């Protein structure tokens, strides 16, 4: 499978922007709520919800044909959404919660992320479909 330079650049630019947005969002939320074990890592939970919402909006727009360029699609999904939302931080924070003995908080965080992520994706997709009518 060949990938064009344009696609690589779109993904790279999207990831650059997504990573910066993720960092700034994390700083903002962390400055307002306790986010270290045994507390819920709210910053990553919110970031993952917003990332799923963004992915839903993107996919909804793609399916309506409003964004047809495959390079731009890759830049928005793999790049922007991928750079913004992260499973690695989710895994690390759960490991820290479990090491701290906060088993219930870890379980709630895992469940909230999975259920909330799917719901946010569905909400974003539905919103994009409604707007694109």
Task: Show the residue positions of the predicted features.
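Membrane-interface helix-loop junctions in multi-pass transporters/channels
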Residues: 1-133
């Amino acid at each position: 499978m060949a990938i064009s330079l344009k696609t690589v650049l779109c993904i790279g630019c999207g990831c650059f922007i997504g990573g910066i947005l993720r960092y700034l969002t994390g700083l903002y939320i962390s400055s307002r709520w306790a986010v270290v074990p045994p507390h819920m890592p709210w910053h990553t939970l919110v970031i993952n919800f917003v990332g799923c919402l963004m992915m839903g909006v993107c996919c909804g727009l793609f399916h309506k044909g409003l964004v047809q360029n495959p390079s731009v699609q890759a830049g928005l999904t793999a790049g922007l959404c991928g750079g913004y939302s992260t499973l690695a931080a989710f895994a690390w924070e759960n490991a820290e919660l479990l090491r701290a003995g906060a088993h219930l908080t870890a379980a709630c965080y895992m469940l909230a992320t999975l259920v909330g992520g799917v719901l946010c994706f569905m909400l974003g997709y539905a919103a994009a479909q409604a707007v694109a009518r």
